[in-house]
Regions:
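Conserved N-terminal beta1-alpha1 strand-loop-helix module at the mouth
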Residues: 1-92, 99-126, 142, 152, ...
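Short alpha-helical segments enriched in small residues
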Residues: 146-150
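C-terminal structural segments of small proteins and small subunits
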Residues: 181-182, 187
Length: 209
């Protein structure tokens, strides 16, 4: 892609949130409305089908000049020609992924606390997804990091930080005020009847930060 990483509004796909809507059409609506980064996430998908979707999403995202990342699966990200991968704490270590993918491949890492954030930065992550910032239905067993925890991470590391989990257009401003450069969003965009309006609400909040 050859462009600077922009994590302002980071869309993560989850087909369960689509409520019957078409994945590609919905992602395109979000791209048209101004999301700045897309992550293809499918926790229990089959490799071949995931690769096909990743290739299609990469093509779609690149039409709008937006990078595509793949959640967890470095192999699929590389084979699909995606721009990067996002790795959780139980996935392939960031340092090992960097060895395989090279210096120009985007690698994001999940961090739940300062220690994990420092390690991910040291190991070569380009950005951090930090949370859960707020309580959320999809992460019932997770103790929220909270805005203060997010602020502490933002003050500690030098790479961009994205707030994850429970972020809505209404609390997005508070996430930015804590020092995050953006937010990763699933249901607050994909689960809405008007995807473009949902994206616009986030961007309006960003413009008033």
């Amino acid at each position: 892609m050859g462009q600077a990483l922009n994590v302002k509004l980071y869309l993560i796909t989850d087909e369960e949130c689509l409520q019957g809507k078409d994945l590609f059409r919905t992602v395109e609506e979000a791209l048209q409305a101004g999301v700045t980064l897309v992550q293809y996430r499918e926790k229990n998908g089959q490799g071949g089908a995931m690769l096909q979707k990743a290739v299609a999403l990469r093509t779609l995202c690149h039409q709008y000049g937006v990078p595509l990342l793949v959640n967890d699966r470095l192999d699929i990200a590389l084979l699909a020609g995606a721009d990067g991968v996002h790795l959780g704490q139980s996935d392939l270590p960031v340092a090992e992924a960097r060895k395989l993918a090279g210096p120009d491949f985007l690698i994001g890492a999940t961090a739940h606390n300062v220690a994990e954030a420092i390690k991910a930065q040291r190991d070569g992550a380009d950005y951090l997804g930090c949370g859960a910032v707020f309580t959320t239905v999809t992460k019932k067993d997770t103790v929220p990091l909270g805005l203060e925890g997010l602020r502490l991470i933002c003050e500690t590391v030098k790479i961009p930080v994205v707030g994850i989990a429970g972020v809505t257009a209404e609390n997005y401003f508070a996430v930015l005020q804590a020092g995050a450069e953006g937010a990763a969003v699933i249901s607050a965009i994909l689960g809405q009847s008007d995807v473009k309006a949902a994206v616009a609400a986030f961007l309006q909040a960003f413009d008033h930060k």
